[in-house]
Amino acid sequence: RKIRSRGQTIRVYSIDGLVSSSELSDFVVKPLMMADGPLDGELAEELVIYNAVGSRVLDMDDAVSKLVNGFCVVLFAEGDAAAFEVKTGEKRGISQPEVENTIKGAKDAFTETVRTNTSLVRRHLRTPELRLEEQVVGRRSLTNVTLCSIAGITNHALVEAVSRRLAEIEIDGM
């Protein structure tokens, strides 16, 4: 999201499903827009810190790490950056699968909401290489599906083939 404050352009980055848009708006964007004078990372921390956990962003790796952990990253005109924690809360509780028994690992099950499911995957795979490709399947139901892969690990040709086959599905509902 790009915002203007006191003639300065500020960019706010976040990952959909991992941050609360209302908290982002109320506790980060609004205080930044109400600032007196030019903004940088240090002043932004002072303005926002009473509402959200914040820290300076040191480099691109730090920014990516913050993004995949439920923070928003704010970039200022001079190249300065800060991150603020605005994690989202769950909608319907993610519970243990009723049909599948697991011995090791997470005991989470997907819900009906694709956004909740993709954020669940992101919480377990906190790598910037995780790729989520969204598509719509079904002529009438227009069901959102997400193809997940990890760049550098997943066979790219296989991902393209699955994506193509999803796009070719001709069905009323899914």
Please report, for each region that a protein language model flagged, where it lies by residue.
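Membrane-embedded alpha-helical signal segments
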Residues: R1-M174
